[in-house]
């Protein structure tokens, strides 16, 4: 049997780049909760003892940016300089201006356009992907790497492994076979975890705890065998972490946010962007389209692309490829997609309820992936049943 290896990585919520994504989306949540018409493009960067938020926000909301930064850092677990950042005593810098009036008139006519007329906030192309290899219709490599990261955070916060600190990375290599275009996982080849830890714990304890409390509950036993390789904190020491160890920036983990290297990516990041930014809303609706194709039994694997011009409501192109796994021709699937999904930005905001912020709605997306999540706030994961015409 001919097989191949493919790898996906993830980082957990204490990674500096992910900290920035979560701050940017916490600010988006706060703006949309008070003013659903908020126009938000919020970036965050961080380094030792400092977090800065900057960008363009036009909103009627009254937002305490500094409080949101400190609260978000504290929730993640950055409560002292020892762990990489002290939420209550770090410097918080804010440099936020209004959205450019040139963009405002072109996209939403200074809020005068009807929803179906609202143009894309920028040019760009986005991809959605789905595969039948997991119940989530997501790639197994990505699902396992992401769940390992989430479990690391869980056992840190519930004190199962009190030696853990917030920063950490995971990576999973899976051996696959190609079944006429569909991906079939055979086994997990390699598991890599690098996690920040305190000064007291031994490397043996780290390896033992990670196997028992993180790997065993996450990776199904059927995928593990005597040849599976484990690299557990292979650098030997990871005490200094978070923004103290590395600078962080919003939008630097776009593959972790999506499909772990499978499918394709148009390059646009998600966090800190309101739904007129098609980098985000466009990527969400093509995930829904691709997932619906697979869930409806029209293909075992599917990728959908959409593209936009700034200020123009209708997409420039929509593309579908089922990797030769389709039960009907791709051209017929494309017709079904165009009939069932409205790719105009204003209509995506309505149909996917994207103008609703607050209650961590967007902040939740900013760690552990935007897709394959079982949560009613992830409206783009709702399947539309697609039926070919008789």
Swiss-Prot record:
Q: Which biological pathway?
A: Amino-acid biosynthesis; S-adenosyl-L-methionine biosynthesis; S-adenosyl-L-methionine from L-methionine: step 1/1
User: Per the UniProt entry, what are the Gene Ontology biological process annotations, in alphabetical order?
Assistant: one-carbon metabolic process; S-adenosylmethionine biosynthetic process
Cellular component per GO, a single term:
cytosol
Superkingdom of origin organism: Eukaryota
Report the cofactor remark.
Binds 2 divalent ions per subunit. The metal ions interact primarily with the substrate. Can utilize magnesium, manganese or cobalt (in vitro).
What is the reaction catalyzed?
A: L-methionine + ATP + H2O = S-adenosyl-L-methionine + phosphate + diphosphate
**Subcellular location per the Swiss-Prot or TrEMBL entry:** Cytoplasm
* Metal-binding listed as a keyword: yes
**Binding positions (L-methionine):** 56, 99, 246, 277
Which family does this protein fall into?
Belongs to the AdoMet synthase family.
The record describes its quaternary structure and partners as:
Homotetramer.
* UniProt-recorded name of the protein: S-adenosylmethionine synthase 2
What organism does this protein naturally occur in? Solanum tuberosum (Potato)
């Amino acid at each position: 049997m001919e097989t191949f290896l493919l790898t996906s990585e993830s980082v957990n919520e204490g990674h500096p780049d992910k900290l920035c994504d979560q701050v940017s989306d916490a600010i988006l949540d706060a703006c949309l909760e008070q003013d659903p018409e908020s126009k938000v493009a919020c970036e965050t960067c961080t380094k030792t003892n400092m977090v800065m938020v900057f960008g363009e926000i036009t909103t009627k909301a009254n937002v305490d940016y500094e409080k949101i930064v400190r609260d978000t850092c504290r929730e993640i677990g950055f409560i002292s300089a020892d762990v990489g950042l002290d939420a209550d005593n770090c410097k918080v810098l804010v440099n936020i201006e209004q959205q450019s009036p040139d963009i405002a008139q072109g996209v939403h006519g200074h809020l005068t356009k009807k929803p179906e007329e609202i143009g894309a906030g920028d040019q760009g192309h986005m991809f959605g992907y789905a595969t039948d290899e997991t119940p989530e219709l997501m790639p197994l490599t990505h699902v396992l790497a992401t769940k390992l990261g989430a479990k690391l955070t869980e056992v840190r916060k519930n004190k199962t492994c009190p030696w853990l600190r917030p920063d950490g990375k995971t990576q999973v290599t899976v051996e696959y076979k190609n079944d006429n275009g569909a991906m079939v996982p055979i086994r997990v080849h390699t598991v890599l975890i690098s996690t920040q830890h305190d000064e007291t714990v031994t490397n043996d304890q780290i390896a033992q705890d990670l196997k028992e409390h993180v790997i065993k509950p996450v990776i199904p036993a059927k995928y593990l065998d005597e040849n599976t390789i484990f690299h557990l904190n292979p650098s030997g020491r990871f005490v200094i972490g978070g923004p103290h160890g590395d600078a962080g920036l919003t939008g630097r983990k776009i593959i972790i946010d999506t499909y772990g290297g499978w499918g394709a990516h148009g390059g646009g990041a998600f966090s800190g962007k309101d739904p007129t930014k098609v980098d985000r809303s466009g990527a969400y609706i093509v995930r829904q389209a691709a997932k619906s194709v697979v869930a409806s039994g029209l293909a075992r694997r599917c990728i959908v692309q959409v593209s936009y011009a700034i200020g123009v409501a209708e997409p420039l192109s929509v593309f579908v490829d089922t990797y030769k796994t389709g039960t009907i021709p791709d051209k017929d699937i494309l017709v079904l997609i165009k009939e069932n999904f409205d790719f105009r930005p204003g209509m995506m905001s309505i149909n996917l309820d994207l103008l609703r912020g607050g209650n961590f709605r967007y902040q939740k997306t900013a760690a552990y992936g935007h897709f394959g999540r079982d949560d009613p706030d992830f409206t783009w994961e709702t399947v539309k049943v697609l039926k070919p015409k008789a």
